[in-house]
Amino acid sequence: YRTERYGADSHRPEEIAYADTLEEDVLRRDFTVNGMAMNRYGEVIDLVGGRRDIKHKTLRTIGNAEKRFEEDALRLFRACRFVAKLDFLPSKELLEAMPKAFHRVSGLSLERVRSELDRLMLAPAVAKGLDVLVQSRLAECSCRVVENGAAREVPILPELYHLVNLPQEKDFHEFDGWYHTLAVVSHTEPDLTLRWGALLHDVAKGMPT
């Protein structure tokens, strides 16, 4: 068992220590679906309602959602990925807590964010995960990149929100710009190059030239 204490870093714990109980170990984790354990007899130990949330296909944080995201801002992107991977819906508390931790995203490295997004893009319910990413406005945050020894902030995918509620020609499109994009991505085979191309194929539509 182990426990963690977080500090100024947006992702890595400041201190890791051994814990005395399974409960202490479980309560430091991110989502209830990741908070179950199994003993040596093959019995599932569920202290956080993980089985209930699996049954109801709900992604929920363990404990206070705002605190979980404040501890590790990468969990914001993991939430989007797990929604896409498991075909779950995020809980109301999770969605409400996300924006309160956006100020921590600027401390995340571009490499870590890109890794989470790439995994999301290959997930079975990719449209669900992308919808959380964009509708929550997480895609408009900036992360950190280091070039030539100097760190700077770079926006993640701010262009995508422009597609939300963007009118389209009704003779050719059933949905607005964003849900049309999600439909295209969903019907594209799970190849990174193809799905990224599908996601960005209409990103400049309606923008000033």
Which residues does each PLM region occupy?
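Catalytic cores of the polymerase beta-like nucleotidyltransferase superfamily
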Residues: Y1-T209
